[in-house]
Every structure is written in structure tokens, then in C-alpha cells.
Curated annotation (Swiss-Prot), chain B:
Subunit text: Component of the Mediator complex, which is composed of MED1, MED4, MED6, MED7, MED8, MED9, MED10, MED11, MED12, MED13, MED13L, MED14, MED15, MED16, MED17, MED18, MED19, MED20, MED21, MED22, MED23, MED24, MED25, MED26, MED27, MED29, MED30, MED31, CCNC, CDK8 and CDC2L6/CDK11. The MED12, MED13, CCNC and CDK8 subunits form a distinct module termed the CDK8 module. Mediator containing the CDK8 module is less active than Mediator lacking this module in supporting transcriptional activation.
Protein name, UniProt field: Mediator of RNA polymerase II transcription subunit 18
Subcellular location(s) per record: Nucleus
Stated role: Component of the Mediator complex, a coactivator involved in the regulated transcription of nearly all RNA polymerase II-dependent genes. Mediator functions as a bridge to convey information from gene-specific regulatory proteins to the basal RNA polymerase II transcription machinery. Mediator is recruited to promoters by direct interactions with regulatory proteins and serves as a scaffold for the assembly of a functional preinitiation complex with RNA polymerase II and the general transcription factors.
Family: Belongs to the Mediator complex subunit 18 family.
One Pfam family from the record: Med18
Length: 306, 208
């Protein structure tokens, strides 16, 4: 391509799927490693506008397929000029499956992570930086409960390094709000009504691997100083509809997870033709973190009986 | 319970406290054109920008005396624009010489399921209205001239009636805490709008 920073250019992308929200996406090169910040959408009537950040060379085509937002309604073949605006608006991402990898027999968490990453590297995946997903739990303060007359609910506030300017707030089996990072400031103001559950912060950190159209993130789940488990996230970039690509994702998962391959995530279940969004990924992480929290509690309650 | 006053503290817990400085006034409908004309001359050169917004005010009642207020605003004429959630603190009392009303503000852009989420958190809608008007900018100052419309049927933004025969004029700046020279600039700008409109510091408590 040989594009310099800020140099305008135009590409055509063929429609891949019409109907519904009408956006077409086609993926060509897949290495957005040149940009630190996630990119997205400056959109206006059928033309998506992206701004190339300085220093990003030819792997720009990779970004386009990430960025087309179905909401725009790009009915006809979209034309893109080369201006990518970094944005916090996580509007769309490829179908993603988040699962837990059990720790191998007789090995530590770190050793199992190394086994997995070595397998990925042998497959041909390229390391592309790190990632972090964290989650804090809040519960309705006792003082508010009396007037509401309902059981206290748990609210999870999560962050994903893939979208550094965003904050995700969700209730279990409830709506997931996508907001900007000022939401954290608001939670501080709401201290009297929502209290952070003690020692509840849980996070997963690890490396990102790119393998063709798949983005694999293997992370160590930690609560405080202790490692509690391993998370594996796999995203298939080109597709935004879960039912269209689950079998392909499953095959890929089997190739490196083997017998530990998970079943279809619950978020896929109800809405077969709905467009996948980052909020769905955060719901999967919340479920994973809750599962790991419960596992630890089980181990801890067993000990006195031994 | 409100957070402790964020008076002069620019930073609390790693985040910058933003304050909203506000001056308000109003003009009768028939004076609107001359005001718009003057503003177009004084303000930054830009395409005249109109807006139609639907604002809902939510309250969370706890055992504290005053409920927690959040304002959710969405655009009715710009499809795809994010929803805007705003928290406004109590007006800072104190310096009588300060020319503008100062209060802590937190602005958050959110996805469209904001109202469902707020209900899940325990907030209940107190009232809603539609605001329709013009927006001007001068540097960091924002001047908004708008009319408030009462919503007759809850949730139906097409069926509205004007609340009064006048337009509300607001001059506001959102800046980090501790920058009081901002209110001087605002007062100087407000002087230029006299006698078309008198913008002044109006304490909401005095009206209640």
C-alpha cells in the first residue's frame, strides 16, 4: 500500500452480507499491530472515515474490516478514505468465545499458560502485545434497600484494554451499559448508594496472539495476589453473527484446546441472528469470573473437612 | 449522600474534578431573532447548529435526605449519537464575588440502553422534557438558546407543548476545578449580550 500518515486513499470492500443492518465486511490483511489505540468510526452517510495515526505503514487494510459499523447502514459497497479516528465507541467486534482452561495435572497456572502459548506459537500465531480485563463488584448499600423493597443486586463494572476509553457496567441477567471512563468517577459519587464488595476485584492479564483471522488472548485470572485460573478468549474477526461462524470457531478452539474445548457460550443462545458486540464479550468474562470465584470458595470450604 | 464538596481540589482519587460554570437568562419569543443575530456575530464562526434533545431526570432515593439526581439526555434529531448522562453536584457557595454558578459535574457518554440500566440500578424517572434550540460556541464557552417543551404523554416525544412563551439562554463552561478566571471571561461575554438578555447567576435553591 505504501501509505504515509494522513494520506487519503480509497478502497472498495465487497458486500458480504446484505439485509439486516446491511453492512458488508471483508477481511484482507490482519495485523493492526501498528496502532496502539483501538480505532473506530467517524461515520457519515455511507462513508466511513478513519484517520491514520502517525507512523502506521501499510497494514492499514487490516483495520477496515474491524471498523465498519453495521449501525451505519452501509447498504452499498462502502468506500473508505484513509482517516482513522481513534474512538472509544466499541460498537462492533468479531464473534468471540471466552472460556476457562483448567490447570494441567501437577502443573502450576503459569506452566499451563506457557504450554498453551507454546502451542499457539507452533501453530504460527504472532504475539501482539498484552491485554487486561478487570472486574469490580458493587452491591446496593443497605440504606437504599429498605426504600426499594427488593433484594440487593450485584453490579459489575468492567474494563477491557481492547477499549481503553470505555467502561462496561452490567447486572447478571440484566442490561450491559457501555459508557466512557467517567463512569468510574460517577461510581465514586455514588459511594453512599453502591458499595464495593470487599476484595472483589478480579482481573485477567496476558498476551494477545494473532493467527490469520483469529485473535487469541490467554490470560491468568488473579484475585489480589493469587492466581486463580486461566482465561482463553478467541475472536473470529470477519464475522459478527454468532450462528454463522460458531462451527468454525469451535474447530479452531479444538485445534489448540483439545478436550478442554467449551460449548457454545450462553450469550449466543437466544439471539441467533443478532450482531455480536463487545458487551457480549464482557458478559462472558463476568460469567467466567463468577465461576472462578465460586471454585475458589469450594476449595476453601473443603479444607476443614480433610 | 453527596460526595464531599470538591471546592478547590483539582484532583480527587486520580481523576480531575470538572466544574460547570453557569449563567442563565431568558428572552421572549419575539426577541429571539435579534439575540441569535447578535450571537452569530459574537461567537465562533460555524454552521448554525440546532438541536432537539429529550432529557429525563432520574432520582435514587436512599435513607439520606436528598435523593441522588442523574440526567439522561438523548438527541432526537441525530440518529446514532450516544446518550449523555450527567451528574451535577450542589452549587458551590462561598465566594460572593464569583460571577457564575459553580457546581461539580460529571459527563458520561453511554450506549442506548441507559434508561433500562438506570432502572435496574434503582433509579426512577422523576420528570422529562424536550429541549429544542440553538447552540453557539466561543472558545470553551457554550451558549445555548432553547425552548422547553412539556411531554403530555409519558414517553411520547412527538406530543409536546411549549412550557412558556420564552427561550432559556444558558452560558456555560466545563473546566477543571480551581479555575475561577473562567467566570470573569463569562461575565465579560455576558456584558456584550446586554440589553438583549441579562445573564446572571441564578441559585436554584432560591427558586424552590
Amino acid at each position: 500500500m505504501g501509505l504515509g500518515p494522513g494520506c487519503p486513499g480509497e478502497w472498495e470492500f465487497p458486500e458480504r452480507r446484505t439485509g439486516g443492518w446491511g453492512a458488508g465486511r471483508s477481511r484482507t490483511v490482519t495485523s493492526p499491530k501498528d496502532l496502539d489505540t483501538p480505532f473506530l468510526v467517524g461515520v457519515s452517510t455511507g462513508r466511513c472515515v478513519f484517520n491514520v495515526s502517525s507512523g502506521a505503514p501499510a497494514s492499514i487494510r487490516a483495520l477496515f474490516s474491524e471498523v465498519v459499523s453495521p449501525r451505519v447502514g452501509c447498504w452499498s459497497t462502502p468506500h473508505f478514505s484513509c482517516l482513522i479516528l481513534p474512538s472509544s465507541w466499541p460498537d462492533t467486534m468479531g464473534v468471540t468465545c471466552v472460556s476457562q482452561m483448567p490447570v494441567a495435572e501437577g502443573k502450576s497456572v503459569q506452566q499451563t499458560v506457557e504450554l498453551l502459548t507454546r502451542k499457539l506459537e507452533m501453530l504460527g500465531a504472532e504475539k501482539q502485545g498484552t491485554f487486561c480485563v478487570d472486574c469490580e463488584t458493587y452491591h446496593t448499600a443497605a440504606s437504599t434497600l429498605g426504600s426499594q423493597g427488593q433484594a440487593g443486586k450485584l453490579m459489575y463494572v468492567m474494563h477491557n484494554s481492547e477499549y481503553p476509553l470505555s467502561c462496561f457496567a452490567l447486572f447478571e441477567n440484566g442490561p450491559c451499559l457501555v459508557a466512557d471512563t467517567n463512569f468510574d468517577v460517577l461510581m465514586v459519587k455514588l459511594k453512599g448508594f453502591f458499595q464495593s464488595a470487599k476484595a472483589s476485584k478480579i482481573e485477567t492479564r496476558g498476551t494477545r496472539y494473532q493467527y490469520c483471522d483469529f485473535l487469541v488472548k490467554v490470560g491468568t485470572v488473579t484475585m489480589g495476589p493469587s492466581a486463580r485460573g486461566i482465561s482463553v478468549e478467541v475472536e473470529y474477526g470477519p464475522c459478527v453473527v454468532a450462528s454463522d461462524c460458531w462451527s468454525l470457531l469451535l474447530e479452531f478452539l479444538q485445534s489448540f484446546l483439545g478436550s478442554h474445548t467449551p460449548g457454545a457460550p450462553a450469550v449466543f443462545g437466544n439471539r441467533h441472528d443478532a450482531v455480536y458486540s463487545p458487551a457480549d464479550t464482557m458478559v462472558q468474562y463476568m460469567e467466567l469470573f463468577n465461576k472462578i470465584r465460586k471454585q475458589q470458595q469450594v476449595i476453601e470450604t473443603r479444607k476443614p473437612n480433610q | 449522600m453527596e460526595a464531599p464538596p470538591v471546592t478547590m481540589m483539582p484532583v480527587t482519587g486520580g481523576t480531575i474534578n470538572m466544574m460547570e460554570y453557569l449563567l442563565q437568562g431568558s428572552v421572549l419569543d419575539h426577541s429571539l431573532e435579534s439575540l441569535i443575530h447578535r450571537l452569530r456575530g459574537l461567537c465562533d464562526n460555524m454552521e448554525p447548529e440546532t438541536f432537539v434533545d429529550h432529557e429525563m431526570v432520574f432520582l435514587l432515593k436512599g435513607q439520606q435526605a436528598s435523593p441522588f439526581v442523574l440526567r439522561a439526555r438523548r438527541s432526537l434529531d441525530r440518529a446514532g449519537a450516544p446518550w449523555h448522562l450527567r451528574y451535577l453536584g450542589q452549587p458551590e457557595m462561598g465566594d460572593k464575588n464569583r460571577h457564575a454558578l459553580v457546581r461539580n459535574c460529571v459527563d458520561i457518554a453511554t450506549s442506548e440502553n441507559l434508561t433500562d440500566f438506570l432502572m435496574e440500578m434503582g433509579f426512577r424517572m422523576d420528570h422529562e422534557f424536550v429541549a429544542r434550540g440553538h447552540l453557539f460556541r466561543k472558545g470553551i464557552m457554550k451558549i445555548v438558546v432553547y425552548k422547553i417543551f412539556r411531554i403530555l404523554v409519558p414517553g411520547n416525544t412527538d406530543n409536546t407543548e411549549a412550557l412558556s412563551l420564552s427561550y432559556l439562554v444558558e452560558l456555560s463552561v466545563v473546566a477543571p476545578a480551581g479555575q475561577d478566571m473562567v467566570s470573569d471571561d463569562m461575565r465579560n461575554f455576558a456584558e456584550q449580550l446586554k440589553p438583549l438578555v441579562h445573564l446572571e447567576k441564578i441559585d436554584p435553591k432560591r427558586l424552590m
